[in-house]
């Protein structure tokens, strides 16, 4: 065996040199020799055996590789000390070889190359017998240390050598006891243990101490082993690749466990690695999976002893801990363990494959690249995918697909190709065509696909294709946004919707009956049906505005239905009835109709009517009482004329307010209806036309028999049925659906409501509430009370020594915009209508209009001004006379306070606030008080969060400045406002906590002021606006003088007088 080992050693020498990492391979040869020596019983003299010890010297390069194999044997010994002893008993013959000759042979690595001659020497056995046992014991201790000490571990791994070859079986016999001990750790150690024992017997006995002593010297010999490993690299990595996948499977990372399993782990790997000399390296690489975990630890241990290669060698034979794990240099690749077990990083092509897979996106990579399949297979996939789309199971659930089908069940092939799953297969339309060409489930026609069996069964009738044209058009006409008033009118009326739905359906039960039935209650698209229902509800005022639309709309939406009714008298009678209703409603119920409109448009009012844009602001005409005698004298005295002005009663104010409404309507009517005068004249003639002969009447109204369809309405209208269909339509702004005559109210030309309803083009009037709710005139109502000098009162300018003089003010909305001219403030005429005349800074008398209030306004000295020019004049006067000295400026403050409540304009508000605060800083608080009144009443009417924040901010500032008026207005707002869950400033809440009643806001008048309050005819109109708070406020106080607006009797009286303006009347209430 020794001779065989020697030739192996020389042959292995180059191999070992080729793979420095696989020193274990060469080492197995020397180990085999050493082991064979002991097995043969002679070999001690054999220098070759000791040259295998030089092989130990080679492991000695690692520093402890040789020792590591011995420790495995020793490991077996540690498994049982008796094992070591038994080993020694077996090797008792070896003691003579313990002589240093082993060490002598170990140092010369060249002797290893010349192993063939020395191998026959028998002393090798002797050496193994004597030296290995003591060495084993020592190495056992070393292994114990190695478990905790990385350096010995490295030595062990480096000493690992899969040199055990065929001679191993003989070796196995003597160390079977050790093997058993190892088998206890690992069942596979039986084969490896003898090998290691034999190796340890020869090499360890002779060179254990030497290897430990001269480990570094042996490292020098390692370099020779490096080239040996080079030869092994190509074979090892390949096998390693296969083995790597298994490496992660074996969890042997804990060095302590390895120490415990020293014998067992190497035993499992050693047999595999030891079996074939050259193949042994490969198997060892395969065994590396288990070593894999140990490799990591061994790498740490072996770092000091020759790097990864040394660690491999040490593992090759060392059974203690990573004996054959890293064999074949596999450990060098452990960096890639976590990534690719097969060292894919080393192989370029494999890396490319992974790259492709990682960056794969079907939209960016062609299907051919992704799916490496032939065209036929790809076509089959495409066909199956699309056939699935058209399968019964899918169509029963896929409503999207069915809605996309046309009447014949076809779907565009482009739609199918756009599905993601099809795109993942291919984006080539031609390929899809080719794939579906021979399909038995679907068929292709031009560029469309459908199911072969019962294709027409699946399409779902969708609105997109057929219904869109009809439903789109009808829905537009029917939707409340398009015809808002009509929809709500019908529903708001006392259940007219149900009769409508019943009555019109039978009349229109033809092909469009379904469509008509649905929109009847919602739209004007079915005016005829609605007209019948309206006949029943003739008295309803709302139908009138919508009905004119109805006759037109049906012509577009349901032309077929109209012709059917046109020949019948129903249509005409319906139209006639509707027209008559319109006339009847316009007579007096237009007020209600307007009121309903306003109620209906309440939401829109909040958005539009309560706000006004800058262009509309430029259309405002201010109506003020500004003759020279009304001007304030330098000394602050007023002429007696103010008394007559202040005495204006609520009735007179109401008349003037109505007059301003009429005036505004005239402005708008004359602009948009230049023929209005002619129509009005004809309307005046309607009264005379009533005298028409019966023949003429029948000619003009060929279908008076409205009774069959409209039994109730015909009575009243007959009295005034006249041939004025065209004129009536013009007057009422309604289209002329037919030439049917309508009766017109005799008072139409004088009815403000009539004109109000007939001026839909007015930007504000049609949206505003009636005159009682949206006043045009803000009068100052006089209080006949005298001031009690000693009575507590509110701290306000009206109670000051020099109270401001408040003036009546009104406004109208002109039909034309009067843009401000910055060049001058002269009285140059503006763009106003001829009726209005020129509006300049110079007051202009009101033009004559058909209303008694005209004379009242004229007699009381009211003049009109373009708003922006009047504002300019006020600002100039304020600048000229000084802050707080301009009566016109105070009138402008008062106007803003009232106007902004119903017609908010951001720019106007900001200017109002700025000027009021500027005046307050100078000690003139009238503008600020007007601002607080606007805050309190305006927010109560239309809450705006940003304004509410300003209200809180200014209230805090006002209170901290020692004033109570702002806090009182805020307190009143919180009490009477409907707004809930308001976020109030904590500081303001603290201030409010001091005031529980309205009386708490009254303070004793300052000394010297009592005599100055003889005359307080003017009461800030903005302060009281008839708010219902007055009762509670007034009730809290007894009657007081003028200086105390909160008094009960006076406050209530003024409220009653101011009912005409509801919130806008200038009443004396506690709010003031």
Curated annotation (Swiss-Prot):
Quaternary structure and interacting proteins, as annotated: Interacts with PABPC1/PABP. Interacts with EIF4A1. Interacts with RPTOR. Recruited to the active mTORC1 complex via interaction with RPTOR. Inhibition of mTORC1 activity strongly reduces interaction with RPTOR and the mTORC1 complex. Identified in a complex with mRNA, PABPC1, EIF4E and EIF4G1. Found in a complex with PABPC1 and SHFL.
Biased composition regions of type Basic residues, renumbered to the chain: 215-225, 312-330
Keyword Translocase on entry: no
GO cellular component terms listed in the entry, alphabetical order: cytoplasm; cytoplasmic stress granule; TORC1 complex
Region (Required for interaction with RPTOR and for repression of mRNAs with a 5'TOP motif): 551-1072
The protein, known as: La-related protein 1
Positions of the UniProt region annotated as Interaction with mRNA: 850-1000
Gene: Larp1
Modification after translation (UniProt): Phosphorylated on multiple Ser and Thr residues in response to active mTORC1. Phosphorylation is important for interaction with RPTOR and the mTORC1 complex. Phosphorylation promotes dissociation from the 5'UTR of mRNA molecules with a 5'TOP motif.
Main location: cytoplasm
InterPro entries, alphabetized: DM15 (IPR006607), La_dom_prot (IPR045180), La_HTH (IPR006630), WH-like_DNA-bd_sf (IPR036388), WH_DNA-bd_sf (IPR036390)
CDD domains documented for this protein: LARP_1_2 (cd08034)
Transmembrane segments: none
Chain positions found as N-acetylalanine: 2
Keyword Ubl conjugation: yes
Lineage, opening ranks: Eukaryota, Metazoa, Chordata, Craniata, Vertebrata
Modified residues (Phosphothreonine): 196, 351, 503, 626, 701, 746-747, 759, 762, 765, 774, 822, 842
Domain notes: The C-terminal region mediates interaction with the mRNA and polysomes. It is required for translational repression of mRNAs with a 5'TOP motif.
Subcellular location field: Cytoplasm; Cytoplasmic granule
């Amino acid at each position: 065996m020794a001779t065989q080992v020697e030739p192996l050693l020389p042959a292995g020498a180059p191999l070992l040199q080729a793979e420095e990492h696989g020193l274990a391979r060469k080492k197995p040869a020397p180990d085999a020799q050493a082991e064979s020596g002991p097995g043969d019983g002679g070999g001690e003299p054999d220098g070759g055996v000791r040259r295998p010890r030089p092989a130990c010297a080679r492991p000695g390069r690692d520093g402890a590789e040789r020792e590591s194999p011995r420790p495995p044997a020793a490991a077996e010994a540690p498994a049982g000390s008796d094992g070591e002893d038994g080993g020694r008993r077996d090797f008792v013959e070896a003691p003579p070889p313990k002589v240093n000759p082993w060490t002598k042979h170990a140092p010369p690595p060249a002797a290893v190359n010349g192993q063939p001659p020395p191998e026959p020497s028998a002393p090798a056995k002797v050496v193994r017998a004597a030296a290995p046992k003591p060495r084993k014991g020592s190495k056992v201790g070393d292994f114990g240390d190695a478990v905790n000490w990385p350096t010995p571990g490295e030595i062990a791994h480096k000493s690992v050598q899969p040199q055990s070859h065929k001679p191993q079986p003989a070796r196995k016999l003597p160390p079977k006891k050790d093997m058993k001990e190892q088998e206890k750790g690992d069942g596979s150690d039986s084969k490896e243990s003898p090998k290691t024992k034999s190796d340890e017997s020869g090499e360890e006995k002779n060179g254990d101490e030497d290897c430990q002593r001269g480990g570094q010297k042996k490292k020098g010999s390692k370099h020779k082993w490096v080239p040996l490993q080079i030869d092994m690299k190509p074979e090892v990595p390949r096998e390693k690749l296969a083995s790597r996948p298994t490496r992660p499977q074996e969890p042997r990372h804990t060095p302590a466990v390895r120490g415990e399993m020293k014998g067992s782990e190497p035993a499992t790997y050693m047999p595999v690695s030891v079996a074939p000399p050259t193949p042994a390296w490969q198997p060892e690489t395969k065994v590396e999976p288990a070593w894999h975990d140990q490799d990591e630890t061994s790498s740490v241990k072996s770092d000091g002893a020759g790097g990864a290669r040394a660690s491999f060698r040490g593992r090759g034979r060392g059974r203690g801990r990573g004996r054959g794990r890293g064999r074949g240099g596999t450990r060098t690749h452990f960096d890639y363990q976590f990534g690719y077990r097969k060292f894919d990083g080393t192989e370029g092509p494999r890396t490319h494959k992974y790259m492709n897979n990682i960056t794969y996106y079907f939209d960016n990579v062609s299907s051919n690249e992704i799916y490496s399949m032939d065209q036929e297979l790809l076509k089959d996939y495409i066909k199956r995918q699309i056939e699935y789309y058209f399968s019964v199971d899918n169509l029963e659930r896929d409503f999207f697909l069915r809605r996309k089908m046309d009447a014949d069940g076809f779907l565009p092939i482009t739609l199918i190709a756009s599905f993601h799953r099809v795109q993942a297969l291919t984006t080539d339309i031609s390929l899809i065509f080719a794939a579906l060409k021979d399909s038995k489930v679907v068929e292709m026609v031009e560029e469309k696909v459908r199911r072969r069996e019962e294709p027409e069964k699946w399409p779902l009738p969708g609105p997109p294709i057929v219904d869109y044209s009809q439903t789109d058009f009808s829905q537009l006409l029917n939707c409340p946004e398009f015809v808002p008033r009509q929809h709500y009118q019908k529903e708001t009326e006392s259940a007219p919707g149900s009769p409508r739905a019943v009555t019109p359906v039978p009349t229109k039960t033809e092909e469009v009956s379904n469509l008509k039935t649905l929109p009847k209650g919602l739209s004007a698209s079915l005016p005829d049906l609605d007209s019948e229902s309206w006949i029943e509800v003739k008295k309803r005022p709302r139908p009138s505005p919508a009905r004119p639309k109805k006759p037109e709309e049906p012509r577009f939406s349901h032309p077929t239905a109209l012709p059917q009714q046109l020949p019948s008298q129903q249509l005409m009678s319906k139209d006639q009835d509707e027209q008559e209703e319109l006339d009847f409603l316009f007579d007096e119920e237009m007020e209600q109709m307007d009121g309903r409109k306003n109620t209906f448009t309440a939401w829109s009012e909040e958005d539009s009517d309560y706000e006004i844009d800058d262009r509309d602001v430029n259309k405002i005409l201010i109506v003020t009482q500004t003759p020279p005698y009304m001007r304030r004298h330098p000394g602050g005295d007023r002429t007696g004329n103010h008394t007559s002005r202040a005495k204006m009663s609520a009735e007179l104010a109401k008349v003037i307010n109505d007059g301003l409404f009429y005036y505004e309507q005239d402005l708008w009517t004359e602009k948009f209806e230049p023929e209005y005068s002619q129509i009005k004249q004809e309307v005046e003639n309607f009264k005379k036309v009533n005298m028409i002969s019966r023949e003429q009447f029948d000619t003009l109204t060929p279908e008076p028999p409205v009774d069959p369809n409209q039994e109730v309405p015909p009575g009243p209208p007959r009295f005034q049925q006249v041939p004025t269909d065209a004129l009536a339509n013009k007057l009422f702004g309604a289209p002329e659906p037919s030439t049917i005559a309508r009766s017109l109210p005799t008072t139409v030309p004088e009815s403000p409501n009539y004109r109000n309803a007939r001026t839909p083009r007015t930007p504000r009037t049609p949206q505003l509430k009636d005159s009682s709710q949206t006043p045009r005139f803000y009068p100052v109502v006089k209080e006949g009370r005298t001031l009690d000098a000693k009575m507590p009162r509110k701290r306000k300018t009206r109670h000051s020594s020099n109270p401001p003089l408040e003036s009546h003010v009104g406004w109208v909305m002109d039909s034309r915009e009067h843009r401000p001219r910055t060049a001058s403030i002269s009285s140059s005429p503006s763009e106003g209508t001829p009726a209005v005349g020129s509006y300049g800074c110079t007051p202009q008398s009101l033009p004559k209009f058909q209303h008694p209030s005209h004379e009242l306004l004229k007699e009381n000295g009211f003049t009109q001004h373009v708003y922006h020019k009047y504002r300019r004049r006020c600002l100039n006067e304020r600048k000229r006379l000084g802050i707080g000295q301009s009566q016109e400026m105070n009138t402008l403050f008062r106007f803003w306070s009232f106007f902004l409540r119903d017609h908010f304009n951001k720019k106007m508000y900001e200017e109002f606030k700025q000027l009021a605060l500027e005046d307050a800083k100078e000690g003139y608080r009238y503008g600020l008080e007007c601002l607080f009144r606007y805050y309190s009443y305006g927010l109560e009417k239309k809450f705006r969060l940003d304004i509410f924040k300003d209200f809180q901010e200014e209230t805090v500032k006002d209170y901290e400045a020692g004033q109570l008026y702002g806090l009182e207005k805020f307190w009143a707002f919180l009490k009477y406002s409907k707004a809930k869950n308001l976020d109030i400033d904590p500081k303001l809440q603290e201030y409010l906590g001091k005031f529980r009643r309205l009386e708490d806001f009254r303070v004793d008048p300052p000394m010297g002021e009592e005599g100055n309050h003889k005359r307080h005819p003017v009461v800030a109109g903005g302060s009281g606006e008839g708010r219902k708070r007055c009762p509670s406020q007034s009730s809290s106080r007894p009657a007081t003088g003028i200086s105390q607006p909160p008094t009960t009797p006076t406050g209530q009286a003024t409220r009653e007088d101011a009912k005409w303006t509801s919130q806008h009347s200038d009443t004396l209430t506690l709010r003031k």
